[in-house]
Amino acid sequence: RSLTRAGILPFLWSRLNGTRRRLKINDIEQVETQALRTMKRGGNVYYRYRTAIRGRGLVFAFASGGDEYRRMIRALLPPLSDNILDNRSIDLRDHLIDPKEVQMKAEFEHIPSAEFLRSEFGKTTSVPRPAAPPNDVERERADYLTGLGNELRISGFLPQAAEAFRRALVIDPKSSRILYGLASCLASIAGTERDLKLKRRAVAAFRLALRDPRIAGETLSRIGESLFQADEPALAERAFRRVQDEFGGNFRAARGLAEIALRDSKLAYVIHHFSAANRFSETPAARRWTRGEVEYFSNLNNDDEYLDLEIGRVEMLESLDGLKRSSLRIALFGFPAIMIGLLVDDTLIANIGWSISAIALLIWTGMNIGVKMLAARIPYDLVETDDVN
């Protein structure tokens, strides 16, 4: 099986520049998903997910917006190794279902509405603790509530998701899986509300999850990845080190340590950790990707000229990306002038608005082309060829 760019334009483009337009499933190296908050209503958030699939130099991107995206996720992600999926992609694979079905499950569990839960959110209430460890029936009940909480969280029903996790914690208060789900939910709410206090509570929940003596290595490494995304590199590194010390290491932990080392500009450690990730790789595609990362950062570490070129490329890429965002905002500022000119029948105001928007959009188009050209790394062979010449 493979992914193929359909349509006449991708076909013509691949013919013109000789690029591939087909990617085998076995050649997928990375799957990353971004969540964009498109609208907020009564405590609930409407997410738009964008999943990027990379391999063999190709990038396929899919955006959510209906049942087609859910079918694509269900068909594409389950056969892939967890190593090549980021946290959010794993969540989508395991918990993405129709929002209407999720709401029906919440109603069946008598979980109150988001408006009611939001009014009660933050109030201090005593949480009963079980006198004895949960039995098999109670643990199964806690697992169901945890799954429901994750489904509600992925669908954007964040207050109801937090309530589902709270009920699961009443049954099994020390479970790392439940605490991890609750922490992820609190982090999402904190990002939506821009609440630093709630963000600290999310980090505290992640730290509580780390105390579970039953915690699995994969859960521990996923918590480390979440802590790194929450801008807590010290806690993330501690979690990844625990995976190494207690479980012998795994791919996600080694990759996470490499990203932390890269953040600190420690190229030798980056190379070391990507080499470890290569040893933990379960698929040829993952081994190929990690081997490429080792070669790339080794070239950066050994060749100052190549390092300077790449630093210049990244700095220029960041500058163009900032100009692209600014030009788009300027283009949007021109639309009110266009509307005012049309409403008051003043062609001068309308023409000024059209000029501002048109020029800004042209600049945005040029910046977008520049960003795409600079996104790819400079091949090291070009530097070697110049040195030989």
Q: Where do the model's predicted regions map?
A:
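Non-transmembrane, membrane-adjacent beta-strand/coil modules in membrane-associated proteins
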Residues: 2-72, 90-94
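Terminal and domain-flanking low-complexity segments
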Residues: 61-155
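TPR alpha-solenoid repeat register
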Residues: 144, 178, 219, 253, ...
